């Protein structure tokens, strides 16, 4: 079984919600953590709570130069990377007939382009060392959109497609890639959302799924994990 201990994990969107939970879980498993996000103060607070070495990098995933600079800082500090978790995301309820183009642009920039920026920066290092694991946070909305999340669902469908294609590209390179697709998760991003009678997941449930994917034997790749409340 693969181990997380002593690995270096880059986690985007680490200042709250799912990203924060993943960062803390990986630290509990013994990984050194790179906390990436825009809220530097909050990232520093989280870093103080970790039991393993941590580096805070204030960066916006939608700005390619920010991510390039982040990777240089990480390599200078730790010397290598092993795990990349793309958990930065934006979820805004918006019907097509709301015509809220600015919200659409934000979700496309963060959810799709942000993920691609991180991939283009980190993949060369992972491929050079012939090892590593990329975790992309998708969503059940990517294949079960509702009438109020068409664009969000489309961005997460894109993450499914990117992950599935990348898995084929990376075959026999030693680098694995997994997409995690949660149902509704109780996080600051969904605060104010009316869950109705629907049950919801906790961010910790997603963090547990990430560890499951990362700790499979070397010959096993978990391509897709779908998590729903019961």
Swiss-Prot record:
Classification via SUPFAM superfamilies: NAD(P)-binding Rossmann-fold domains
Oxidoreductase recorded as keyword: yes
Annotated residues for binding of NADP(+): 10-34
CDD domains attached to this UniProt entry: SDR_c
Enzyme active site: 152 (proton acceptor)
GO MF term set: oxidoreductase activity
Keyword Oxidoreductase in annotation: yes
UniProt cross-references to InterPro entries, sorted A to Z: NAD(P)-bd_dom_sf, SDR_fam
Positions of substrate binding: 139
This protein's UniProt keywords: Oxidoreductase
EC number: 1.-.-.-
UniProt similarity note: Belongs to the short-chain dehydrogenases/reductases (SDR) family.
Protein name: Uncharacterized oxidoreductase SERP2049
């Amino acid at each position: 079984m693969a181990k997380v201990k002593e690995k270096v994990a880059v986690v985007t969107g680490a200042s709250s919600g799912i990203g924060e939970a993943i960062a803390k879980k990986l630290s509990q498993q013994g990984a050194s953590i790179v906390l990436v996000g825009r809220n530097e103060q909050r990232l520093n607070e989280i870093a103080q709570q970790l039991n393993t070495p941590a580096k805070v990098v204030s960066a916006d995933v939608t700005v390619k130069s920010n991510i390039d600079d982040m990777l240089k800082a990480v390599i200078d500090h730790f010397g290598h990377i092993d795990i990349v978790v793309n958990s930065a995301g934006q979820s805004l309820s918006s019907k097509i007939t709301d015509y809220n183009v600015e919200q659409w642009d934000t979700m496309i920039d963060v959810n799709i382009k942000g993920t691609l920026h991180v991939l283009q920066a980190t993949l060369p290092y992972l491929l050079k060392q012939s090892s590593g694991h990329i975790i992309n946070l998708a969503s059940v909305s990517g294949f079960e959109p509702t009438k109020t999340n068409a664009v969000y669902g489309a961005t997460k469908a894109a993450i499914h497609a990117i992950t599935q294609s990348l898995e084929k590209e990376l075959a026999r390179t030693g680098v694995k890639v997994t997409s995690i697709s949660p149902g509704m998760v109780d996080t600051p991003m969904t605060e104010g959302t009316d869950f109705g009678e629907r049950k919801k997941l906790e961010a910790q449930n997603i963090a547990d799924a990430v560890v499951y994917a990362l700790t499979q034997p070397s010959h096993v790749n978990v391509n897709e994990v779908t998590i729903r409340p019961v």
